[in-house]
A protein has these predicted regions:
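Multi-pass alpha-helical membrane architecture of UbiA-family
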Residues: 1-280
């Protein structure tokens, strides 16, 4: 792979972008259930492209706004903006182009998606700006990902979501992502404390298991009550069980291992359960 392309993919955290796509497809599937239209391949591809563009825009602005902190944080000194592998001017260009393209693709789907597209972008931009407000930044990040469930629905149907289950799934995603951000931020607890960042790890003095468990219990409850039928319920119960078990391994396994073993499979399990329920 070309080294510049590899650097770009690393900069935008392409693996996290792929991780988000199943949440978009939850909204798409429920939107197709409402509209009863033939499988719109082009539209689905455009929605996936829009999700990727939104994530690129959000990741880029996050890196730009966090650059002063990243330069001082030993854990983030290897990041591409800090090392100069990606120039600040290049990052700004990536941000502008991805944001504009996202809005254009959203309008190409339907008017409502286009009009609501700035809200999706704004949710990504708020995350780095709220890190000094106690606790809230974890949930802002969660909302920015949870909202894409609704965005998938709007993109495919052109209307506001009416099924309460869709909002339940959106809340589940928001809380579940927030719980992982708490685990992730624990890596920077001492650094964040010196910089006045009031994350849950800082406020709890590193005792994050209880808050993470509480968030995961609530998120799992939303996941289970949002089930569309028996088959969907089985897979959601399995996902909820994995989510709760993951708390046990905090501090026992590296965060990357927790992500790969307990977080990465969840969206695919849930999506498979929904797909199976709707097909049978």
């Amino acid at each position: 792979m070309d080294s510049r392309l590899k650097t770009f993919l690393k900069f935008i955290r392409i693996e996290h972008t792929i991780f988000d796509l199943p949440f978009v497809f939850i909204g798409i599937e429920l939107g197709l259930l409402k509209t009863h239209i033939a499988f719109p391949y082009i539209k689905i591809i455009l929605i996936a492209i829009a999700a990727i563009l939104a994530r690129i825009s959000g990741m880029t602005i996050n890196r730009l706004l966090d650059l002063p902190l990243d330069r001082e944080n030993p854990r983030t000194k290897h990041r591409e903006l800090v090392t100069g592998e990606i120039k600040i001017s290049e990052a700004r260009t990536i941000f502008i182009i991805s944001s504009i393209l996202f809005i254009l693709v959203a309008f190409s789907l339907n008017i409502l998606a286009g009009l609501l597209s700035p809200i999706v972008l704004l949710s990504f931009y708020l995350y780095p700006l709220t890190k000094r407000i106690p606790i809230i930044s974890h949930f802002i990040l969660g909302i920015s990902i949870g909202i894409i469930v609704l965005a998938g629905y709007v993109g495919i149907s052109g209307s506001f979501p009416m099924q309460w289950q869709l909002y339940g799934y959106s809340v589940f995603v928001a809380l579940w992502i927030a719980s992982f951000d708490v685990i992730y931020q624990d890596q920077d607890r001492e650094f964040d404390r010196t910089k006045g960042i009031k994350s849950i790890p800082v406020l709890s003095q590193g005792k994050i298991k209880v808050p993470v468990l509480m968030i995961n219990l609530v998120s799992s409850a939303f996941l289970i009550i949002s089930s569309l039928g028996f088959l969907n319920l089985i897979f959601n119960l399995l996902s909820g069980l994995i989510i709760i078990i993951s708390v046990h391994w905090i501090g026992r396994k590296h965060i990357d291992t927790i992500f790969k073993e307990f977080y990465l499979p969840i969206p695919f399990i849930i999506l498979f359960g929904i797909s199976l329920q709707l097909l049978l």
